[in-house]
């Protein structure tokens, strides 16, 4: 990341968060976000681990290698460590289809570009003893920066409407997902121990 881009990226995130308070006519609302928007992933997001292409398998292995150090949430959330310093959105995300856990955002990575080895968010499942277990990564692009869905590894991002207003794609690099490697929700992840 170029140091002179930091203020611009922060400004973009601030604008995206402000826009999150405004209705977006062609984007699902927060109440339909869990069902409609995530359904937009289509068949591509339901690819199970055994059905991944050779390129996708290698990419997941590369993501695991790049994010291995984030198993230590203290390092991941330190400003001088991983830089994933804020929750976005706040709280443990769950739905009838499974959960995603807590999302930690690296604000400096949010822009119109998607970099496989530099995900904008890392996701953690809360454990019974207060520990946080790394389960996957999430890539986002503010809707305001891309009129069409970005793609990664041949999989289109899904639009998430207010209050988030982003395109999103999950990779369950650290927790097997029977719904698929790129599915939005993972039934093997739980918010049961969220505090």
Tell me what each language-model feature is.
Residues 18-20:
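C-terminal motif of bacterial Sec signal peptides marking the signal peptidase cleavage site
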Residues 9-14:
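Sec-dependent signal peptide recognition
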Residues 22-25:
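Bacterial signal peptide processing site
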Residues 37-195:
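Primary mode marks residue(s) on the alpha4-beta5-alpha5 output face of response regulator receiver
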Residues 29-33:
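N-terminal secretory leader/proregion of peptide precursors and effectors
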Residues 1-8:
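N-terminal secretory signal peptides that target proteins for export/translocation
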């Amino acid at each position: 990341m170029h140091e002179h881009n930091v203020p611009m990226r922060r400004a973009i995130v601030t604008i995206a968060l402000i826009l999150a308070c405004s209705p977006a006519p062609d984007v699902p609302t927060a109440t339909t976000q869990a069902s409609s928007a995530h359904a937009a992933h289509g068949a591509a997001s339901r690819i199970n681990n055994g059905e991944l292409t050779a390129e996708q398998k290698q990419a997941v292995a590369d993501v695991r290698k790049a994010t291995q150090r984030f198993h230590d949430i203290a390092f991941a959330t330190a400003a001088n460590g991983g830089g994933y310093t804020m929750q976005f959105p706040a709280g443990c995300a769950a739905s009838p289809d499974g959960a995603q856990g807590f999302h930690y955002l690296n604000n400096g990575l949010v822009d119109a570009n998607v970099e496989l080895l530099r995900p904008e968010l890392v996701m953690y499942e809360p454990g019974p003893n207060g520990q946080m277990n790394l389960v996957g990564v999430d890539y986002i692009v503010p809707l305001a920066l891309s009129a069409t869905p970005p793609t990664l590894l041949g999989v289109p991002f899904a639009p998430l409407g207010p209050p988030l207003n982003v395109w999103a794609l999950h990779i369950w690099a650290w927790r097997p997902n029977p719904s698929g490697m790129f599915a939005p929700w993972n039934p093997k992840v739980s918010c049961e121990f969220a505090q």
